[in-house]
Swiss-Prot record:
Catalytic activities: L-glutamate 5-semialdehyde + phosphate + NADP(+) = L-glutamyl 5-phosphate + NADPH + H(+)
Biological classification of the source: Bacteria, Bacillati, Cyanobacteriota, Cyanophyceae, Synechococcales
UniProt similarity note: Belongs to the gamma-glutamyl phosphate reductase family.
GO annotation, cellular component aspect: cytoplasm
Species, as recorded: Prochlorococcus marinus (strain MIT 9312)
One GO-annotated biological process of the protein: L-proline biosynthetic process
Record-linked Gene3D superfamilies: Aldehyde Dehydrogenase, Chain A, domain 1, Aldehyde Dehydrogenase, Chain A, domain 2
UniProt KW Lipid metabolism keyword: no
Transmembrane feature ranges: none
Protein's recorded name: Gamma-glutamyl phosphate reductase
Superkingdom classification of source: Bacteria
Amino acid sequence: MANIFEVPQPGNDLLEKADQVRLASIKISQTENHNRIKALNSMADCLEKSTKEILEANNEDYTRAQKKGISKALLSRLKLSKEKLNSGIEGVRKVGDLADPVNQVQIKRELAKGLILERKTVPIGVLGVIFESRPDAVMQISSLAIRSGNGVMLKGGSEANLTNTAIVKALKKGLYESGLDKNAICLLTSRKDSMSMLNLEKYINLIIPRGSNELVKFIQENTRIPVLGHADGICHLFIDNEANLEMALSVALDSKIQYPAACNAIETLLVHKDIAQVFLEKAIPLFNSNDVKLIGDKRTVELGVKYEASVEDWQTEYLDLILSIKIVDDLEEAINHIQKFSSKHTDGIITENSTSAKKFMNVVDSAGVFHNCSTRFADGFRYGFGAEIGISTQTLPPRGPVGLEGLVTYKYFLNGDGNIVDDFSSGKAIYTHKDL
């Protein structure tokens, strides 16, 4: 790992950029809600005006990436169509429609006469986001950062440098034209800078990596800055013996092929032995006709799956049109397999038995547990968050798709009238602890 990534100390240029973002984030944290909404609309306007420039930059990035032989999965994420760009721009505007996450009172309590405690949400500060390929992520991340009163330092994959630069140029112009500090958004373009970010604990409050398993794990192990993210997206779908067959086929297909490069696409399909033959005799030709390479255990091979799986296949995130299939004896075996190999991202069950569904959803320890629906719904936009900055598979919150609510923390505000603890110790004053 250390041979692939190194963590150099930040140079003066990076330190200056980080300080500019830090100072801008302080200003934005004090900005009124309506001004942050105004900024988002201005950012969207500038993106629209820069459509031609952005798409031309993306075409150049895509052509260069093809010549370098970049994988199909990364090429798919890199490509920015006009429709995808327009959708991203609309997403920036929709983030402005979401409720203000800042200055929300979570607790208001009278501790004693004249002593009032409040717990209120506040921006985190500066976000450091490292991601691969997807230039549309720049729009999502930046809009969520500004909406929640944070600054952001962005580092995308080098294959998208031209596209990301064009997008950030428009976003910064939008900030400036709205009256906010354009330095709240900063794009880094070198790998050295992205690794040096890990040593910016005096400037960055949260690192959000969105990339390969190897990159995410390295970041988690090599920074003192808190990290929000997931290293793998090994998602499962279990077809129970009491599943509706047509539903199972439809959901399984959507969960795999709707966008196979997504982290919420399934990598393993588990099938109850009592329904395996009737299900697979329809599923195998269905997946084959959609160019999905099927890999299975011995029992599935006997039923027509072409390639036999190894243990490695059960713990591989393909991000491609490849699917591992395993036949299990019962619900318990399905759950045990998931608990052993799942990355705790999203796992689902197809069944008409509500008791089985309830047990599956209560026992499987993943950020998302789904019943009778596609795993592809595990997404901040589809959850109604407006957009997501990432997905967290950690047990402590935030967990799952992270939108605005995951980009604020809280402070305790205590207002008194000369109150001192000694009065309570001596009995001169008493605590009332009354919620207001």
